[in-house]
Amino acid sequence: MLGILKTRTYWTVSIWFFCMYGAFFSLSGLWAGPYFIQGYGLDKSAAGGVLFCLALGSTLGPTLIGFLTPWLRLPKRGLLLVACSATLLLGFPLLLPRPVIPAALLPLWGVAFGIFCGGFGGIALTRIQDDFPPEIVGTATGMINIYTYLGSALLQLASGWIMEAQAPGAGAYTLPQYSRMFILYMFMFCCAFAASLFALRDGGAAGTRCSGLQSGAR
């Protein structure tokens, strides 16, 4: 286990999961509903539809990506940069202090955001499968999955503190208050992008270093 913690691969993938999946589950589970109700003026039924589309995108994403990957010319690790870039682009409207996404397009936005932010975890885990010996892939994967839950929990706390600091004791928030809070999530997406760059730059050398763990795993 200590050998796993010493590898760059482990930390780059862990940071990616902490930032991307932690942010996705925190945002979709805690703030997306109130944001679209209070900020965009949707009723609960319409907001629930957007939440459903977020979940649908994250569910269909891995299957869709697995189907398309063999037909794409990008390497699997390069797809992480695509996911982060698309997430940043789709998340940009959340930073604006006024509604900019037409209500009719919100379900489509939800599916797309779910796919790119919550559907690329399988691609990230191929880094572990490629760089670690089979004997410890399961251990390394289990250790990395912890960061999804850790990221979600900590980001819910941090975002709650930000909103409470802006409007102490308020039961509802304004769109500008949400937009300032979403800076935290965009920062997480930028960190995930940086982690993807490190993973790509690491190249085949990481596999050579990680393969040295095989003797210790026996």
Label each residue range with its predicted role:
Residues 131-168:
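A late C-terminal transmembrane helix in Major Facilitator Superfamily
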